[in-house]
């Protein structure tokens, strides 16, 4: 992979998103399908993999008073603005909200959970005259199929099964090679990395000025002035990531910069690293480079653990990337960066994902705190040895082990979590899907 490849990959994976990306994905698919039809909507049929449903069923939608994937699909069908991508929810108005609520109230929005291992969202929007259909696969905005009635408008399904060339190149790299590539980049090429800091900082500022969520961030902020937590780098990072996540999960009307398809991953990476860079008085160039490194490493880990899995990606992928980045910002060696990754694997691998919701703020705070501890241990020559559990001799082998723990290791965990969360009418369907796997 060369510099141009890295910039291109980062521009694919580090993008703005308004709202939790799972309901946004459902809305985007419905918007694309609805754009192909006219007239009054008589049915909206949504199909999605269990992980997508799990992550979107309990999270707030910005500018909207209801939660759930039915409402997300209805909003998309009314908006029809699929070309806005992951920011399509910016188009919500009171009249759009009323129309979406009315569609769900008519009981014409239906969801089917389907046996797809990776991210999958299919939408069919029906009117009296036409039937529009869309399929999103692989990542939250990757529309691979569109049809109007029997006429195929777009079909990229054959190419959607695997990674593209850029991701294949990243997959084959070592952590050290990702570090070297980021170190050689120019600020003019990586300046867009700072856009994510500004965007996510705006969400944190919004939370500081408004009553948002259930008080997680406010309490952490207050605790920094007390005797138990104190005001230090670890507590400030915990507060920053928690405030952004709590705001985003409860419908803050601002977009965040995502990473590897997840807004909370982007929050973890950008806010934790920005706070650390401020603490060490890093230059803008150093900040740009370390953000590029961490975003690339986050994608690298997610390619092993899965886009939507039983593991909390914010803790397992994003916060592990933060641990490596904190070592990076202190001038640590490649070996110490690798050791921070191994320490994180020993620490919080197995943290479950039980869907997108306000409680994610707690997990982001916990994982970020673990990142600070893991980096501090690594900088002082402490690493969990390869004979301990899933830890291996190299960060690459350890990351591969994390992936194996996720899939197939935690498939049954995902089954249990999803069946605990979904409405009773979906339980047997979900169990049968996981049995087939």
Residue ranges and their predicted role:
Residues 2-37, 41:
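N-terminal signal-anchor module of multipass membrane proteins
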Residues 3, 17-21, 51-52, 137-141, ...:
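A structural signal for small-residue-enriched, beta-sheet-centric alpha/beta enzyme cores
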Residues 16-32, 254-271, 313-317:
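Conserved phosphate/anionic-ligand binding catalytic regions in large, soluble enzymes, centered on
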Residues 23-39, 266-283, 323-331:
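Alpha-helical support elements that line or immediately flank enzyme active sites
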Residues 40-44, 84-89, 110-112, 188-194, ...:
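Flexible, glycine/charged-enriched surface loops at secondary-structure junctions
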Residues 42-86, 98-109, 286-336, 340, ...:
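A structural-propensity feature for long, helix-poor, extended segments
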Residues 105-251, 416-437:
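Signature of multi-pass transmembrane helix bundles
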Residues 227-231, 235, 248-281:
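Membrane-embedded translocation segments of transport machinery
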């Amino acid at each position: 992979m060369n510099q141009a490849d890295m910039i291109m990959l980062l521009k694919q994976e580090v993008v703005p998103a308004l709202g939790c990306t799972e309901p946004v994905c459902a809305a985007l698919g419905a918007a694309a399908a609805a754009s192909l039809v006219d007239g009054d909507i008589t049915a909206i049929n949504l199909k999605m993999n269990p992980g997508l449903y799990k992550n979107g069923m309990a999270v707030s939608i910005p500018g909207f008073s209801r939660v759930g994937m039915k409402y997300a699909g209805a909003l998309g069908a009314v908006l029809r603005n699929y070309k806005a991508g992951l920011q399509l929810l910016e188009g919500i108005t009171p009249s759009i909200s009323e129309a979406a609520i009315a569609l769900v109230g008519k009981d014409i929005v239906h969801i089917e959970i389907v046996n797809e291992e990776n991210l999958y969202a299919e939408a069919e929007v029906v009117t009296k005259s036409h039937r529009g259909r869309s399929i999103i696969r692989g990542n939250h905005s990757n529309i691979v199929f569109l049809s109007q009635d029997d006429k195929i408008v777009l079909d990229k399904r054959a190419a959607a099964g695997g990674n593209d060339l850029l991701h294949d190149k990243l997959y084959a790299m070592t952590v050290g090679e990702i570090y070297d590539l980021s170190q050689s980049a120019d600020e003019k090429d990586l300046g867009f990395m700072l856009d994510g800091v500004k965007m996510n900082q705006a969400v944190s500022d919004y939370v500081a000025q408004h009553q948002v969520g259930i008080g997680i961030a406010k309490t952490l902020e207050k605790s920094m002035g007390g005797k138990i937590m104190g005001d230090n780098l670890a507590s400030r990072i915990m507060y920053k990531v928690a405030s952004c996540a709590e705001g985003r999960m409860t419908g803050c009307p601002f977009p965040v910069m995502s990473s590897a398809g997840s807004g909370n991953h982007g929050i973890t990476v950008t806010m934790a690293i920005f706070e650390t860079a401020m603490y060490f008085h890093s230059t803008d160039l150093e900040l740009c480079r370390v953000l590029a490194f961490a975003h690339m490493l986050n994608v690298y880990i997610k390619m092993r653990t899965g886009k939507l899995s039983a593991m909390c990606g914010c803790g397992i992928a994003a916060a592990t990337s933060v641990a490596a980045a904190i070592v990076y910002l202190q001038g640590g060696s490649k070996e110490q960066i690798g050791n921070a990754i191994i320490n994180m694997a020993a620490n919080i691998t197995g943290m479950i994902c039980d869907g997108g919701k306000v409680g994610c703020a707690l997990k982001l705070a916990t994982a970020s705190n673990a990142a600070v501890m893991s980096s501090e241990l690594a900088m002082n020559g402490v690493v969990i040895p390869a004979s301990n559990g899933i830890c291996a001799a190299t960060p690459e082998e350890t990351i591969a082990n994390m992936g194996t723990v996720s899939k197939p290791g935690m498939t049954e965990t995902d089954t249990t979590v999803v069946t605990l969360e979904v409405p009773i009418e979906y339980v047997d369907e979900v169990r049968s899907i996981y049995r087939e796997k």
